[in-house]
């Protein structure tokens, strides 16, 4: 199967991947192309920009969490009704799980998808030396097809031309465009990285302005040509994560989505929907009641610490969620969702805001990142998503700390080594119907996660 596709990779973090990937995606969309957008790795924020730019949900591709077949299935799933795929890389091109185990790198994903790569290079502090960097990236792994280069943070057109000529002379790799230094093109950041698209503001106009800049200095037609000359796609895996025909809805699951909670893998939502859950959305910040006739609740991660005052003040929603938990409704809360279920959130300025109180203890924001990285875990006790002994892969990234309450633990961490043996996650409620954890799970690691959540939700309310 032939399908145009391109990977936008950087030589490091902060090389401009999200800015340029979003701009190219928006430029292609503006021209009428239906773009399937993807983000390598476990990040939640960058996909929001790509979703906005493509006007279509972005999927995460993670070969460490999912493995080759599941990751490839997610890729094919995202191609439906699209005509070109754009994949934004993660960190530097070759950065993966570790030096000895390079799984999860942009290079590995590009290789598994047989996709050509456009390499981004920040040239703000170099000239001809840019050629040496590109040459090194090309020679490190000849299996990776670096088909073009984009130069970011050029000081002037003359600066760009010096770098372009050197790269094309010494590497025979075409330079397909550049961006000048321009603070107006910088995406705002906060403690978890870039600001999320769910926080509102003028992001739609920002994306369109970005697309206009991209079109003026980057050769979109040349990028299209590179994408169209990609080799045939690898064989499509047999359906495993998604049913060939979506199941009839058997229950309704409410998804918390607003400025406070927006961290969801699109595949998680699609798997729930395709395996039999009708999804409905609500806002813990703005709504005063839960959607009617629901069998389960999913509260993802996000920035509850930024919206803590508003969450705390919405007593009607807190009461509704507490009652749902006490009534035995299945509730799954990840990271920011876990913080919302705790007694209170203490923000960076030591202000304390009361939350639901389903989970004993106060979630306290730390001055530095508390835990970060890929994680393997074994299920320690049966819960609404998985049975005892199941091994899961996920990702942890949080600045808050919650003293371990005396509740039943959900998981035992196996990896990385510094966390091995630690308990993670909490099972709460008289009927153990609430699961809260800092561990972000991609349901593609095990489709039974989605199926089990649907099963227990149907047990509470069936359509």
UniProtKB/Swiss-Prot annotation:
Residue ranges constituting the GATase cobBQ-type domain according to the UniProt record: 252-448
Catalytic site: 335
InterPro entries reported in the protein's UniProt record: CbiA/CobB_synth, Class_I_gatase-like, CobQ/CobB/MinD/ParA_Nub-bd_dom, GATase_3, P-loop_NTPase
Catalysed reactions, as listed in the record: cob(II)yrinate + 2 L-glutamine + 2 ATP + 2 H2O = cob(II)yrinate a,c diamide + 2 L-glutamate + 2 ADP + 2 phosphate + 2 H(+)
Annotated site residue numbers, Increases nucleophilicity of active site Cys: 440
Documented EC number(s): 6.3.5.11
Molecular-function GO terms, alphabetical: ATP binding; cobyrinic acid a,c-diamide synthase activity
Source organism superkingdom: Bacteria
Keyword Magnesium carried by entry: yes
GO terms for biological process, alphabetical: cobalamin biosynthetic process
Cofactor list: Mg(2+)
Role description: Catalyzes the ATP-dependent amidation of the two carboxylate groups at positions a and c of cobyrinate, using either L-glutamine or ammonia as the nitrogen source.
Similarity comment: family membership: Belongs to the CobB/CbiA family.
Note: The a and c carboxylates of cobyrinate are activated for nucleophilic attack via formation of a phosphorylated intermediate by ATP. CbiA catalyzes first the amidation of the c-carboxylate, and then that of the a-carboxylate.
Recorded domain comment: Comprises of two domains. The C-terminal domain contains the binding site for glutamine and catalyzes the hydrolysis of this substrate to glutamate and ammonia. The N-terminal domain is anticipated to bind ATP and cobyrinate and catalyzes the ultimate synthesis of the diamide product. The ammonia produced via the glutaminase domain is probably translocated to the adjacent domain via a molecular tunnel, where it reacts with an activated intermediate.
Name of the protein in its database record: Cobyrinate a,c-diamide synthase
Lineage, uppermost ranks: Bacteria, Bacillati, Chloroflexota, Dehalococcoidia, Dehalococcoidales
Protein's gene: cbiA
